[in-house]
UniProtKB/Swiss-Prot annotation:
InterPro entries: Mediator_Med12. Belongs to the Mediator complex subunit 12 family. Transmembrane segments: none annotated. The keyword Transcription regulation applies. This is Mediator of RNA polymerase II transcription subunit 12. Residues 1-117, 1481-1525 are annotated as: Disordered.
Length: 1583
């Protein structure tokens, strides 16, 4: 029944599944009106309408492109439909079959038609009745006409006969022509046939809803009373005898014994009947349209007709010209602007004929398939060339239109499956990679078309990700930052989409480190989603990456990072930041305090700055809530009297903490009494008792002091011994400083020197006593200065230079720098220039320690204030200005003060240089002579007179002073320091002339035989600033490089030895009573060793080599070199060690010998006569976080000795054992030791670890039932983890070509792991319902072991990824087979459904899974093991050839029944990529990969899911589509795995895309088109 048009049925034009067909040329009924009427009809169209669509009209008279004849057409009926359906109700059909362009029919308020839409014969004009106004009513268009013209519209004309009505021109020509002006056309000869409207709604089974053309014999065409009143209904005839259920009949049959068999036979017969009826037996009669040979003119005319949409394709199919193929075909389509759908039709016709030509040649099927594939590749290459040509023509005329057409055409060819997907998409990605920045936007626009196809498989997706990231890296260069900003935004958008929606394509094993920052810049890290995604991607990439750098493999442990922070404090002086960073680095506060105390006392560091750094850090941690008292006592208990630690520094730290009341002495005494170590039978050397003796007593309460003395007395240490020592020291010091302590000490007995073995209780008491004495040593109420009596401040210190030198000597020998800082603070109130200069030099010498204490800035400001006071009262001394400038240069915040001080210095020097010559210089020969007894007084008068000095006078005085220095004049009693100070005062008069004379004198001294005085002359010259150590070393180096000058220098070896001695600092036990000049020399010495340590090492090496070649190395030279080298090693461990390694590799035997002695002293090695291997064991055994660089050096020395003595693999064995032991103890020092070994030695250690790893059994099975009894073998897992750690850390030793022998072992291990899994799953299925608790526990043990071994083997695969590459020497088939087996094992294990889901719940952050039940378990942060396994498989597939990937896919599809339920997993198709179906291509499949679980073939086929019966997986998979046939879209349902059932392969019905051709035959036949039976869910069955 066809309901009324107003019944509200769905209109065909609304159906979204059907495209609109271009309608034929039609004429509006308005064309029959006059011009004025036509204008009235068009006027309302200017108003905006909701939808501008034409009503549906049945065309019974015209055909697209045909001429309307005046005679009736043939009697074959035809039904055409307009191009656009109406959005309103169904409109009536006009007699001439044309739509009406009236506003009334296109608006939703139009009056519904009184007649239903009905097709009628051509000669019928009854439809024109609908044009006549009914019931005298006025239509809306008439009302509009009346409103505009003011009079009623003219009545419509009479109907025009259809065969007398001329239709307009073809669609697209908007002009309306009269009937007479239409050109005459030929009569249509093609028989008319009814066509289903393309916009009709399609029902199931390809039926069209409510479409029954008028034939006269349809039930709907019968007009009777019932149909006239009620309409026509399609009623289903239901049999009255049918019952509601089949139970009674079936139940009766089941009562009989043979009833069940009979029913089975009936159902089997019904199935066979249905199968026989469903088979298509008739072969296809489709033939491609033939091609004919045409002339050029006819070919051009044919192409123009093809470009004309009004010319039907069926007519053009008769004369398809030869010679249009390849790129020429595409160029013709572009030049003629042939519509895309018609251009694709031409390409299909040409392609179908080309492919059909291969079959007509009588070749075999396999050859035909090969030729067809070759032709398709060539055709794809032509398409690529066509598109490349257009892209290269960018900027030409009409380029945009041509490019738009070309992109649309090539996209249509691609999606019609007329191109080779792999070749075309590969070319697209290659073009994007090679595109210049100017053409990248064009390729990005095309990228949106092929985005889904590219991202469907990892092979393409990863390549696209790298290409986009590389382009983004190029355009983000600074020179393109602004001009290419839109391109940067577009690339960032694509990359962001990749990361968010296609995360697996951004897993880049080889380039993640290069593009990581770019990926981060494309994301919004403020968004939690983007942040989580980036962290996930970064972690996944880190899991599958292998560092090839030694530095990365040996990353610092937390302990080493903390030690680096400790070292940095001594140079940065930022205690607060370091304290916070240390607390964040190590959570174990006990370990943190232990490392700090060990760093303070280790012999592998130097300087008292460590002590005060430790004190400040401990005080910071104390304020942060850390119980440092407990941790310090715990450290002392564990340490004992360790000879390797300088315990005096530990006691110094504790004494400083006691001074600042940070360390609780009372709590320590309680701990001692509770411990009971202070009994009378304890030894004096007990560390607890020794600390008790070290505690300062100055600020302790009386009861605590009494308790300490009591405990000491019980331990056998009388308190009077400490008091007597303090009294002796005070007497000794008071004897040297009578002006300060003259009345405080009863006796003045002078002690030669204070004992070095003094406790900090004594040192602290002496320091407090000295500070009190200095604070009371002040000047009188008045003083005379510069001849003027001025009132003096009572707080002005009366210290003299000698007194300051003595006090500084005592405190520096004690190491009590905090007390020295207080003394210097009190000294700043002195008005003596020398004392203030010495105080500034003292601060400069202990700069790092004073900075850590926090006193440097305050002391510098106080010294500057004293300098300003002296400047107001008189002329300050040059020494003070020099000292303040040198100290201020080390304080960045005091740059303004230094600038002012430099101005003062320049003013003083310029004043001396510009002053007029003194009268004393008129006769220099008699004025000043070193033989004159009054030489010194005259010189003082000359230098302090403020007058000038000419160059001759300066030369005379300079000669006199140098004679005194060289000892030529012994009558003048001037020391070297005083003489050099005079030289320094002489220099400001003429600095350049003085420097020239000094250089000539030094060069002459080097060449003279009296050079023995050089070691005594240089230190004071350096101390006063006339000579610098760096300048002198550079001068000697230049002189020795010149052969002419070097030949005049006597004994160059001794000269180099003197330079070396010049750099050796004084020994700790040596007296440090230094005056201003000597102290400055040691300050310059310290500065040179810190800044120019490399030059110092060169001096040592040069002196050793020169003296060894001359007369051998004496003990003095060896001692100096050893002392200096040890100091440098402790100051700059890492840099000096690297220098020494270079010297060792350069075969400096003498330097290596001295270096070995130095290392023996540092490492306290005494087994010098033992074999090298024993020494190596001792060195490795004593390695810790501090001695690591020195042990590296020592082992390198031993390794060189081993190579000379050919000791074999001795040290390699020792190092391997050390690596195992250190790894078992959770240490990492062995990494640093191995890093310096030769590559061959490192490779041997790694190979031994790999051998031991592969020797560990995978599972420890118990006796009895081998299938379910798995005992927990934690020891084996820990051992495997240990060796795996060693292999991972030494992965950088793997050569670039890989280790080919490891690949087959890993494949076998993975096969064995899969075999164990299959056996376990089979046993679980066969024992369902009878599993005991023991079996459950055994299964859990098995799963945990499986997770560990799977993770460990995956890590080994990542490490040895290059081992699976195809070498030239190995047969390719064998390598491909191993690669496929490895992929199969990884896929099967990773997707196996274990009962506890341990592979999904257990992250791969740790190799050892913990026994946690899956109930209520939340996955830990990290990448799940399953995801990690698939990432590893992806990294392998990136490097494997396509053959391995295809073999793996075929095996998983065809011969892996236990895992059929995962065959349709998207991850399989994404990783393995498109695999051609061997069955549909008529090519026999290649040899299948052997099953990794072949050993389990005798067991029943298991299923990975324990909840499914044995056959459920097969039944589930058999209902799933499979295979990727030729011509089927990749993303359709049919592009999945094929199934094998009862010897037959079931797959989708294949249809060649070249044969899906419409209008192929000139005459309509029964089966003239290729139908894709896939739409009917049909399958092709092959036996």
């Amino acid at each position: 029944m066809i309901p009324h048009s107003s019944a509200g049925v769905q209109q065909w034009g609304h159906h979204p599944l059907h495209a609109l067909n271009p309608g034929a040329g039609r004429t509006d009924t308005a064309s029959a009106l006059g011009p004025s009427d036509l204008q009235l009809e068009k006027a309302p169209m200017s108003a905006p309408q909701p939808q501008l669509r034409q009503p549906a009209v049945v065309d019974l008279t015209t055909h697209s492109g045909d001429t309307s004849e005046r005679e009736p057409p043939s009697k074959r009926l035809r039904l055409d439909l307009p191009s656009v359906a109406s959005t309103g109700d169904a409109s009536p059909a006009s007699g001439n079959g044309e739509p009406r362009n009236t506003p009334s029919t296109s608006t939703p308020t139009a009056k519904p038609s009184s007649l239903s839409w009905r097709g009628r014969p051509v000669w019928s004009f009854q439809a024109l009745i609908s044009e006549i106004p009914g019931s005298g009513g006025m239509s809306e268009e008439d009302a509009a006409a009346v409103a505009q013209s003011g009079k009623p519209a003219s009545p419509p004309p009479f109907p025009v006969l259809p065969w007398k009505y001329a239709p307009p021109e073809a669609a697209g020509n908007k002009s309306v022509k009269s009937r007479d002006s239409s050109p005459a056309k030929k009569v249509q000869t093609t028989p008319y046939h009814i066509e289903c409207p393309s916009v009709a709604p399609v029902l199931k089974g390809q039926k069209v809803a409510d479409f029954s053309p008028w034939t006269g014999n349809h039930p709907e065409d019968v007009l009777n009373e019932q149909t006239a009143k009620q309409g026509h209904y399609d009623r289903t005839q239901v049999s009255q005898n049918e019952s509601n259920t089949a139970r009674p009949s079936l139940y009766a049959q089941l009562k009989h014994r043979s009833g069940l068999q009979m029913l089975s036979s009936v159902f089997a017969a019904a199935l066979e009947k249905r199968q026989s009826h469903n088979l298509v037996n008739a072969p296809s009669t489709f033939k491609p349209p033939p091609r004919v040979t045409l002339t050029d003119n006819k070919r051009e005319a044919w192409l123009r007709d093809l470009a004309n949409p009004s010319v039907p394709l069926r007519r053009l199919s008769r004369t398809i010209p030869h010679g249009i193929r390849g790129k020429a075909l595409l160029d013709q389509c572009l030049s003629k602007w042939i519509p895309v759908n018609r251009a694709v039709w031409l390409a299909k016709c040409v392609g179908a004929n080309e492919i059909r030509a291969f079959k007509r040649k009588g070749t075999s099927g396999a050859v035909v398939i090969g030729l067809e594939a070759k032709w398709v590749r060539e055709w794809t290459a032509h398409v690529q060339q066509f598109l490349e040509g257009l892209v290269a023509a960018c900027g030409t005329a009409d380029w945009k239109m041509k490019m738009t057409y070309a992109v649309g055409l090539t996209a249509r060819l691609f999606f019609e499956r007329l191109l080779d997907d792999e070749q075309y998409l590969g070319w697209f990605l290659s073009s994007l990679e090679a595109a210049s920045l100017n053409t990248v936007p064009v390729w990005l626009l095309m990228l949106g078309i092929y985005w889904d196809s590219i991202m469907r498989y990892r092979k393409r997706g990863r390549r696209l990700a790298e290409a986009l990231l590389e382009k983004l890296r190029q355009v983000t260069n600074p020179e393109h930052a602004t001009t290419l900003r839109p391109l940067v935004d577009r690339l960032s958008l694509h990359i962001r989409t990749l990361v968010v929606e296609h995360t697996s394509s951004v897993i880049l094993p080889n380039s993640w480190a290069k593009y990581k920052d770019l990926v981060l810049s494309c994301l919004n890290m403020k968004d939690n989603t983007h942040k989580a995604i980036f962290q996930n991607v970064a972690e996944r990439n880190a899991r599958i990456q292998l560092s090839k750098d030694r530095q990365d493999s040996g990353q610092r442990s937390p302990q080493q990072r903390v030690i680096h922070l400790f070292d940095a404090v001594c140079s940065t002086h930022d205690v607060a930041s370091a304290a916070a960073a240390c607390l964040k680095t190590i959570d174990d506060k006990s370990l943190l305090v232990t490392k700090l105390l060990e760093w303070t006392a280790t012999p592998f560091r130097c300087g008292l700055c460590r002590v005060y750094t430790a004190v400040r850090l401990l005080r910071k941690w104390k304020m942060s809530g850390v119980d440092i008292d407990t941790y310090i006592l715990s450290f002392l208990t564990r340490t004992g009297n360790r000879a390797s630690l300088t315990m005096d520094n530990i006691y110094h730290v504790i004494s400083e903490l006691v001074r600042s009341q940070t360390f609780s002495v009372g709590r320590y005494l309680q701990w001692l009494m509770a411990k009971g170590v202070s009994s009378s039978n304890q030894s004096d050397h007990s560390i607890d008792l020794y600390l008790l003796k070290q505690l300062p007593m100055t600020r302790l309460p009386d009861h605590v002091r009494n308790l300490r003395n009591t405990l000491l007395y019980r331990a056998g240490v009388p308190a009077t011994l400490e008091d007597s020592t303090i009294a002796e020291l005070k007497a000794s010091i008071a004897g040297r400083l009578p002006n300060i302590f003259g009345n405080e000490v009863e006796h003045t007995m002078v002690v030669e020197s204070p004992s070095l073995d003094l406790t900090w209780a004594v040192k602290s008491e002496i320091g407090q006593w000295l500070r009190r004495g200095i604070s009371g040593h002040c000047r009188n109420a008045t003083s005379a200065m510069a001849g003027i009596t001025v009132p003096a401040d009572r707080n002005v210190s009366r210290l003299t230079p000698d007194e300051f030198y003595h006090i500084r000597d005592v405190l520096e020998s004690f190491g009590d720098l905090s007390m020295l800082a207080d003394v210097v603070k009190q000294t700043t109130s002195c008005d003596d220039n020398i004392v203030l200069a010495s105080a500034a030099d003292t601060v400069n010498y202990h700069f790092d320690s004073f900075c850590v204490i926090g006193a440097t800035s305050d002391l510098f400001r106080s010294l500057v204030e004293s300098y300003a006071r002296l400047k107001r009262l008189g002329t300050p001394n040059l020494d003070l200005v020099f000292s303040l400038i040198e100290l201020g240069l080390r304080l960045p915040q005091e740059c303004n003060t230094v600038a002012l001080l430099r101005q003062d210095l320049l003013r003083i020097e310029s004043k001396s240089a510009l002053a007029a010559p003194s009268p004393l210089s008129d006769n220099p020969s008699t004025a000043i002579n070193e033989a004159d007894p009054s030489f010194r007084s005259k010189l003082d008068q000359l230098l302090s007179s403020g007058g000038g000095m000419d160059e001759s006078t300066m030369a005379s005085i300079f000669a006199s002073l140098t004679n005194i220095l060289t000892g030529r004049n012994e009558d003048v009693k001037l020391s070297a320091n005083e003489t050099c100070r005079y030289l320094a005062y002489l220099r400001p008069f003429h600095p350049k002339h003085f420097d020239a004379m000094l250089v000539r004198w030094v060069c002459g001294l080097l060449k003279s035989s009296a050079r023995s005085t050089m070691p005594h002359i240089l230190p004071p010259l350096i101390g006063v600033g006339c000579v610098t150590i760096h300048a002198f070393v550079f001068l000697v180096k230049k002189l020795l490089q010149s052969e002419r000058i070097a030949s005049k220098i006597p004994n160059p070896a001794r000269l180099k030895m003197d330079i070396l001695d010049l750099l050796v600092p004084p020994a700790p036990g040596q007296s440090r009573y230094f005056d201003l000049v000597t102290y400055r020399f040691h300050l310059a010495q310290q500065e040179f060793l810190l800044k120019y340590y490399k030059e110092t090492l060169d001096i040592i090496c040069d002196a050793l080599s020169t003296n060894a070649a001359a007369a051998g190395i004496n003990s003095e030279l060896r001692s100096s070199a050893t002392t200096l080298l040890r100091l440098l090693l402790a100051q700059e461990p890492e840099d000096v060690v690297q220098y020494c390694l270079q010297k060792i590799s350069a075969q400096h035997s003498t330097f290596t010998s001295v270096l070995q002695d130095t290392l023996d002293q540092l490492l306290q090695s005494v087994s010098l006569h033992d074999p090298q291997v024993s020494m190596a064991e001792n060195v490795i055994r004593t390695t810790d976080d501090f001695s690591l660089p020195f042990c590296q050096l020592k082992l390198q020395v031993l390794s060189n000795a081993e190579s000379k003595e050919n000791m074999g693999d001795g040290i390699v064995d020792v190092m391997f054992k050390a690596a195992v032991a250190d790894t078992r103890a959770k240490g990492s020092n062995w990494i640093g030791l191995v890093r310096l070994m030769s590559p061959n030695s490192v490779q041997q250690i790694r190979e031994r670890a790999e051998k031991e790893f592969f020797a560990v059994p995978l599972f420890a099975e118990t006796l009895g039932d081998q299938s379910l009894s798995y005992a927990p073998n934690t020891e084996a897992l820990e051992t495997a983890k240990l060796y795996l750690t060693i292999i991972d850390k030494l992965a950088y030793s793997i050569p670039e070509a890989g280790v080919q022998s490891v690949g087959p072992i890993l494949v076998e291990k993975m096969d064995l792991l899969l075999h164990k899994l299959v056996v376990m799953q089979t046993s679980l299925v066969t024992r369902q319902g009878v599993v005991s608790d023991q079996a459950t526990q055994s299964r859990a043990n098995f799963e945990r072991a499986l997770a560990f071994w799977f993770s460990a083997l995956l890590r080994m695969i990542v490490i040895h990824r290059t081992a699976f590459n195809v070498p030239s020497s190995v047969p390719r088939a064998t390598v491909v087979q191993d690669q496929s087996r490895l992929l199969v094992s990884i896929f099967c294990i990773s997707l196996a459904r274990l009962p506890t889901n341990i592979l999904r719940l257990y992250p791969t952050a740790d190799y050892f899974p913990h026994p946690i039940s899956s109930e209520g378990y939340r996955p830990c942060p990290g990448i799940l093991l399953q995801t990690h396994a698939l990432d590893v498989a992806a990294s392998l597939i990136d490097t494997f050839p396509d053959e391995s990937r295809q073999q793996c896919a075929r095996f998983l599809k065809d011969k892996c029944p236990p895992f059929l339920q995962f065959q349709n997993d998207n991850r399989f198709s994404y990783l393995l990529g498109p695999v051609p179906d061997a069955g549909t291509s008529n090519i026999p499949p290649p040899a299948s990969v052997p099953s990794p679980a072949a050993a389990a073939a005798s067991t029943p086929t298991p299923t990975p899911s324990s909840g499914l019966p044995p056959g459920s997986s097969t039944q589930q998979a058999s209902s799933t589509l499979s295979g990727i046939p030729t011509g089927v879209s990749e993303d359709c349902v049919a592009s999945r795995l094929r199934l094998q059932y009862r010897g037959r392969t079931i797959g989708p019905y294949p249809v060649r895309p070249w044969e899906l051709l419409e209008d192929a035959a000139p005459i309509v036949g029964v089966n003239d088109t290729a139908v894709n039976l896939k739409f009917f869910d049909a399958r092709r069955v092959r036996a």
